[in-house]
Amino acid sequence: MEDGVYEPPDLTPEERMELENIRRRKQELLVEIQRLREELSEAMSEVEGLEANEGSKTLQRNRKMAMGRKKFNMDPKKGIQFLVENELLQNTPEEIARFLYKGEGLNKTAIGDYLGEREELNLAVLHAFVDLHEFTDLNLVQALRQFLWSFRLPGEAQKIDRMMEAFAQRYCLCNPGVFQSTDTCYVLSFAVIMLNTSLHNPNVRDKPGLERFVAMNRGINEGGDLPEELLRNLYDSIRNEPFKIPEDDGNDLTHTFFNPDREGWLLKLGAQAPSPPSLPGGRVKTWKRRWFILTDNCLYYFEYTTDKEPRGIIPLENLSIREVDDPRKPNCFELYIPNNKGQLIKACKTEADGRVVEGNHMVYRISAPTQEEKDEWIKSIQAAVSVDPFYEMLAARKKRISVKKKQEQP
């Protein structure tokens, strides 16, 4: 018994030393806790003093406005509600649109999400927001650059459709006579956005030339063709300078992986692409354990759970999933391209030296630890697999133009 503390008599010298170290560390922690308590008490006193001196209504208003912006960035609807309830924003489409258009301290992804909602107020705000853009005497690419920089386009097809429809109506109103209908403007706008992706996405190897871009847009002007000079100017503008897309979180991918649809350890088989004739035997396919994260219609895999950057990214766009039997591993499934004619899956991976290269898979074969986990992964991936909404909406709008033309024919 030492200083009122019981000490077993049969301790070895090493155990006594370890016990003494624990007691000493405990005492240090108690001292540290007391110091933190005193610092916290001082800080609270300072805060209370500051609040007591904040008699300025302007200062209080600014604090509430900053709080409202933060709330908007986390939940746009609740943020607007907070600002309206605190009389910082009038509950009219015009005032809300002006607040979003100025965008001070606002997350552009949150702006896009709010504008894309289908509720009556949101739709009115969308049209008021678009009306704040001045597109007069701008060509279509210039107008799109301005429009797409003011918010981040959401991923849902229905939201994109409403926003691009509003853009087309505004552009045609500002530039009467350029296109015969808003449908033409709508279709060409999507064609330009797709061209931007094709020309500047490193994963797209087949870069469309001017002739293909012109051919792609034949007959979209109420059944007629647009002037080739107009299409050439749009093509050159995109080729020379890609769209600048707002990135609220910079290049840090960490934010992407918050609240994923699913995550866990899986085994991934090496590249499935056939070897070139010049390389007999090809590379040996091996199974590698990777940490997979499913989010935002993409499958990311990491070497370790603590890695900030993924080793590979597999966009699920236009892919399908199926169960497969493998003699070497149980609980397998595959990602593949339906009706595949030899093309590789659009994906990328990071080599050991840091280089980012295109994936070399015609299929991705993956093994889960258990049957139950395999079923859950398949279910989650099936829910995330998407068909590019641009192609779906373009096809629907082109069909509408074609039907309209046939109806007008005698």
UniProtKB/Swiss-Prot annotation:
Cysteine-cysteine disulfides: none
Matches recorded under InterPro entries: PH-like_dom_sf, PH_domain, Sec7_C_sf, Sec7_dom, Sec7_dom_sf
Coiled-coil portions: 13-56
Domain SEC7 stretches: 54-241
Keyword Transferase: no
Region (C-terminal autoinhibitory region): 397-405
Signal peptide positions (record): none
Membrane-topology descriptor: Peripheral membrane protein
Main location: membrane
Record remark: domains: Binds via its PH domain to the inositol head group of phosphatidylinositol 3,4,5-trisphosphate. The PH domain is necessary and sufficient for plasma membrane relocalization. Autoinhibited by its C-terminal basic region.
Function: Acts as a guanine-nucleotide exchange factor (GEF). Promotes guanine-nucleotide exchange on ARF1, ARF3 and ARF6. Promotes the activation of ARF factors through replacement of GDP with GTP. The cell membrane form, in association with ARL4 proteins, recruits ARF6 to the plasma membrane. Involved in neurite growth.
Full protein name: Cytohesin-2
